[in-house]
């Protein structure tokens, strides 16, 4: 099926046109998270009640969070490597991966792998679905009002159902969980997306919809309709739990969780969100340049003062 795709070399991309990444888009539409302020609150909480923060300073709490993030990034890279071996059907590479990463003694990695294998077996079970490609870099050109820019991204995996003539975009996650339900304290997203809650499910949906828009615009066979492109967010958790709401079924023992998009695909809405993020990115770049210029001028002034003596 990969031969049916077009423009995979991305030679059509005009390097003179600016771009913003889809990760940056999600960053700009999400309320700022002040880690230091939250860590200080955790420190104060630890002083008043006996909890996991008791005896820790806010700097130690920040260090713990950074260590946890680094570990998650490491496992994310390992999972990417395993999925590549599995999707490419290279049994020797799979065996080598298992040995090199000592998977037999790593319960977390075993859980990630089990979740992926279960999902892969489930989606391929009918015999109608074919693996198309992975780590596909896509460029989505947006022209709205007086702005012309790209939203750049890299989709995790693409499948094709030959019976239904449907393309399936997959975005892998390896979170402990994906937040789908908020409460009265849950903040909203920003800009044109402020009608949506600040939850993983919604920002991940923004991500896969960008891939969908890009594929329809530049990569899938011409004439492909939006209804023939399905998006799925699949969580491959680090610990086992029984899946109760998987899209592909509710079989006991399944530990992956598959989510359909949180809201309907609306190209006009998406482009407004992307334009907002592009403007924010442009503004931040201008502010950084101005700050760098001011710092440079300050250094020159200090040097001139020094030269006087």
What are these regions (language model features)?
Residues 68, 101-104, 189-202:
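Short histidine-centered catalytic/ligand-binding loop motif
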């Amino acid at each position: 099926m990969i031969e049916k795709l077009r423009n995979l070399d991305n030679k059509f991309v005009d390097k003179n046109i600016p771009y913003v990444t889809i990760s940056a888009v999600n960053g700009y539409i999400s309320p700022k998270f002040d880690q230091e302020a939250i860590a200080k609150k955790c420190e104060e909480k630890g002083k008043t009640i006996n909890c996991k923060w008791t005896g820790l300073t806010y700097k130690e709490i920040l260090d713990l969070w950074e260590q946890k993030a680094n570990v998650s990034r490491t496992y994310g890279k390992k999972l990417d490597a395993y999925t590549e071996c599995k999707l490419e059907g290279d049994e020797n590479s799979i065996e080598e991966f298992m040995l090199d990463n000592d998977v037999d003694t790593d319960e977390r990695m075993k859980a990630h792998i089990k979740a992926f294998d279960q999902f892969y077996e489930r989606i391929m079970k009918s015999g109608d679905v074919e693996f198309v490609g992975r780590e596909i870099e896509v460029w989505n050109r947006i022209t709205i009002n007086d702005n012309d820019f790209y939203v750049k991204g890299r989709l995790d995996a693409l499948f094709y159902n030959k019976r239904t003539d449907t393309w399936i975009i997959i975005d892998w996650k390896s979170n402990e969980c994906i937040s789908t339900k908020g409460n009265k304290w849950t903040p909203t997203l920003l800009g044109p997306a402020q009608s949506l809650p600040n939850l993983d499910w919604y920002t991940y949906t923004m991500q896969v919809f960008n891939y969908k828009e890009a594929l329809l615009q530049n990569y899938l066979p011409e004439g492909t309709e939006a209804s023939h492109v399905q998006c799925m967010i699949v969580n491959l958790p680090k610990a086992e739990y029984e899946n109760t709401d998987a899209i592909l079924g509710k079989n006991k023992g399944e530990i992956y969780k598959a989510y359909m998009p949180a809201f309907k695909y609306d190209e006009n809405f998406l482009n407004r969100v992307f334009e907002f993020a592009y403007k924010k990115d442009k503004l931040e770049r201008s502010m950084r340049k101005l700050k760098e210029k001011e710092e440079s001028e300050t250094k020159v002034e200090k040097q001139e003062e020094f030269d006087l003596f």
